[in-house]
Regions:
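Edge strands and adjacent loops of beta-rich recognition modules
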Residues: 184-196
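Nucleic acid-processing catalytic cores of prokaryotic defense/repair systems
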Residues: 60-65
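An alpha-helical repeat/solenoid feature that recognizes helix-turn-helix modules
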Residues: 1-8, 24-50, 67-94, 116-151, ...
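Alpha-helical repeat/alpha-solenoid scaffolds of the HEAT/ARM/MIF4G superfamily
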Residues: 145-159, 317, 322, 326
Length: 528
C-alpha cells in the first residue's frame, strides 16, 4: 500500500480506475455553446425548458457567457442566438409574459456583450477553441437575422459584426462538412437534417450533440433515428437538460489517465482493468479517436500506445505514420495548426517503442529526433510551451519538457532547463500553479514536470524539491477537503467550448502524489 501523509493512494487509484472503465462519457461540465445549439435545433428533446433555464442561470454580470480572455465570444453568441430563437418561435408563451420579459432582457444584455466581444475578435482574432472562426461567422449571421426580424417584442440591441470566419464557413457549407473531421460542425450547415453522408456512431454524429441534433432535424424524428435520440436523451439527463462539449471523450480520459499513472510507476496490476480496456479498443484499426463519432487522431493513439508500452503491452505504431509530415506530425486530417502536445505525445510513444526494441525501432528513433528538434524550435522565449488543445501552458509544458527530457536524445538539456525555470517562476504563494488561478489540474502538471525532469537519477535540486513539495501540499489539502471530488477549476481543454475531464484531472493529481511519494527528497519536506 502506498500512502502519503495518511492518504491511501493505492485505494484512491483503484477507485479511479474502476470509474474510468465504467464512465463512457467522461465529460462532467455542461457547455453553454452546445446547450444553446440544442435549444435552437431540438426543442422537441427532453429537457428543453431546463436548457433554457441553464442559459439564464449561466449569464454573467457583464451580460456574457463563458470563460475569460476571449473565450466568451462563442458561448455568448450561442446563448444569445438560442434565446432569440426561443422568443421568435414562441416557446416562452406558455410560461407567461414575465418569463418572456426575462428572456428578452437576457438577450439584450447578451447582445451588448457580444458586440463588445466581437470588436475584440475583429482586432485580435478568434479564440483558440475548435472551429471558433466559422462558428462566430455562422452565429453572427443568425443573430443579425433575428435582430432584423418581424417577431413581436423582438430583441433590440446593437448589430454584431466580425470579419472572421466567412471563408471557412463557406467552405464548410459548400461540402467540406462531408470530411469526417468536419462533420463535427454539422450544426453550422443549413438543411443538414437526414444527410446520408453523416453516419452516427453509438448514436453520435461527429461526436457532437449539436451536430447530432442538426442531423435529426427540428421535429422529433421517427424510429430509424432511435439510437441518436436515445443517446441525446441520456446525455442531457446526466446534467438535467444541458449538454457537454462532446458526446464522449472516453478514450482521451482513459488514455491520458493511464499514461499519467503508468509514468508515475503505479503497479501494473492496479491499472490492469484500464490497460485491458484500452488495449481492446485499440485493436481493430490501430488508432483511436477521442470518443465515438470522431475520427481517429494521432494524439489519442500516441498516448494510448505510450501508456500500454509503459505497462509492457507493445502495439505497433504504424498508424502514427499516417500523420507524419516530415518535421512534425499532424493530429488530424485536415489540420491548420500543428499541436505541440500531440507531437510531444508522439515523441513519447515512438521513443518508448524504440527503447523496447520494437520492429520499427530505427524509424521511430529517427522520427523522435525530428520531433524533439521541432519542439525545441516551438519553445517560447520564456521557457514554456503553448498548445491549441488546452488553455493552460502548464499542460503543454509538462508534455513537451518530459518528452524532450526522456526521449529527445542528447543536446536537449538547455531546453529542459528553461522549462524548469519557467515552472519554478510561476508558483503561487499557496503552492499551486494556474493560468487564471491555482487549480488542481495545473498544479499536478507542474509538479510532474519538476519530478520527471529533475529526479530521474535519485537526486535532485533542493529548490525544485521544495517547489514540488509545496505543490503536493496544495494537492493534499484539496484531497482532504473534497475527497473524490477534486475540483478541476475552470474548464481548460479546447473543444468548440472549454471543457473539463474530471477523471483525467484526478489521475494527474494522484500521479503527481504517487511520483512524489517515491522520492525521499520531496516527501521529507514538511509543508503542512
Amino acid at each position: 500500500m502506498n500512502t502519503l501523509q495518511g492518504l491511501d493512494l493505492t485505494a484512491e487509484i483503484r477507485a479511479l480506475v474502476a470509474h474510468l472503465v465504467a464512465d463512457r462519457i467522461a465529460i462532467a461540465v455542461p457547455s453553454v455553446y452546445e446547450t444553446g445549439r440544442l435549444v435552437t435545433l431540438a426543442p422537441w428533446l427532453d429537457g428543453h425548458e431546463q436548457r433554457i433555464g441553464f442559459l439564464l442561470d449561466e449569464q454573467r454580470a457583464d451580460g456574457g457567457w463563458g470563460g475569460p480572455d476571449g473565450y466568451a465570444a462563442v458561448p455568448t453568441l450561442s446563448a444569445v442566438e438560442a434565446i432569440m430563437t426561443v422568443l421568435a418561435r414562441g416557446d416562452a408563451v406558455a410560461r407567461g409574459p414575465r418569463h418572456a420579459a426575462t428572456l428578452r432582457a437576457a438577450a439584450e444584455r447578451g447582445l451588448r456583450a457580444a458586440a463588445a466581444l466581437l470588436t475584440d475578435v475583429a482586432a485580435t482574432g478568434p479564440p483558440p477553441t475548435a472551429g471558433a472562426a466559422m462558428i462566430i461567422a455562422a452565429l453572427t449571421e443568425a443573430v443579425n437575422e433575428h435582430a432584423g426580424g418581424p417577431a413581436p417584442g423582438a430583441v433590440t440591441g446593437p448589430a454584431v459584426r466580425t470579419g472572421v470566419g466567412a471563408a471557412q464557413l463557406a467552405r464548410l457549407r459548400g461540402g467540406a462538412w462531408r470530411i469526417p473531421l468536419l462533420t463535427h460542425y454539422l450544426e453550422l450547415v443549413p438543411g443538414a437534417a437526414g444527410a446520408a453522408e453523416a453516419r452516427p456512431v453509438d448514436g453520435a454524429v461527429g461526436g457532437s450533440a449539436a451536430a447530432t441534433a442538426a442531423w435529426l432535424g427540428p421535429r422529433r424524428p421517427g424510429p430509424s433515428a432511435a439510437p441518436s435520440v436515445r443517446m441525446l436523451t441520456e446525455l442531457q439527463a446526466r446534467h438535467g437538460g444541458p449538454l457537454p462539449t462532446f458526446t464522449s471523450q472516453v478514450y482521451v480520459a482513459q488514455a491520458w489517465s493511464l499514461a499519467h499513472l503508468a509514468m508515475a510507476g503505479v503497479d501494473a496490476a492496479v491499472l490492469a482493468p484500464l490497460r485491458d480496456t484500452l488495449a481492446a479498443a485499440l485493436e481493430p484499426a490501430g488508432g483511436l479517436p477521442g470518443g465515438p463519432g470522431l475520427p481517429a487522431d494521432s494524439d489519442t493513439t500516441a498516448v494510448t500506445l505510450y501508456a500500454l508500452a509503459r505497462l509492457g503491452v507493445t502495439r505497433s505504431p504504424d498508424h502514427l505514420w499516417e500523420y507524419d509530415t516530415g518535421p512534425h506530425f499532424v493530429t488530424v486530417h485536415p489540420e491548420n495548426e500543428p499541436s505541440t502536445s500531440a507531437n510531444a505525445h508522439i515523441l513519447m510513444a515512438l521513443g518508448e517503442h524504440a527503447a523496447r526494441g520494437g520492429p520499427a525501432a530505427g524509424r521511430g528513433a529517427a522520427a523522435a529526433a525530428r520531433i524533439a528538434a521541432w519542439l525545441g524550435e516551438r519553445q517560447r522565449a520564456d521557457g514554456g510551451w503553448h498548445d491549441k488543445w488546452h488553455a493552460s501552458p502548464f499542460y503543454a509544458t509538462r508534455s513537451c519538457a518530459i518528452a524532450v527530457h526522456w526521449y529527445g536524445g542528447p543536446g536537449q538539456a538547455a531546453v529542459v532547463d528553461r522549462a524548469v525555470r519557467w515552472v519554478l517562476g510561476r508558483q503561487r504563494a499557496d503552492g499551486s500553479w494556474g493560468r487564471w488561478r491555482g487549480t488542481a489540474e495545473e498544479t499536478a502538471y507542474a509538479v510532474q514536470t519538476l519530478l520527471h525532469t529533475r529526479f530521474g537519477s535519485g537526486s535532485g535540486d533542493p529548490v525544485v524539491a521544495r517547489a514540488a513539495a509545496r505543490g503536493c501540499g496544495f494537492l493534499i489539502r484539496l484531497l482532504r477537503r473534497d475527497g473524490s471530488d477534486v475540483p478541476s477549476g475552470p474548464p481548460l481543454f479546447h473543444g468548440k467550448d472549454l471543457f473539463a475531464l474530471p477523471g483525467l484531472t484526478r489521475a494527474a493529481v494522484l500521479a503527481a502524489l504517487e511520483s512524489a511519494g517515491r522520492r525521499p527528497e520531496v516527501v521529507e519536506i514538511d509543508v503542512r
